[in-house]
Swiss-Prot record:
It comes from the Bacteria. NCBIfam families: PRK04323.1. Disulfide bonds: none annotated. Belongs to the RemA family. This is Putative regulatory protein tsl2331. Signal peptide: none annotated.
Amino acid sequence: MLNIGFGNYISPQRLLAIVSPDSAPIKRLILEAREHHHLIDATHGRRTRAVLVLDGEIIVLSALHPETLVARLSPPP
């Protein structure tokens, strides 16, 4: 399981991408996911720093930086 912050976890097998929320296409993706009830907000009211795209068109918002999530996903050396 991948800790995405604040005690929230996702299955790494379902993870397709970890992206920054700053670009316009990603913002549109978030809006569409919210409209279709495919959005999970795991930020606990904090600023969104990473958008996780899961299979099944599920979008997860995280307050952790993408680099932090990738480091947690990678096995230790």
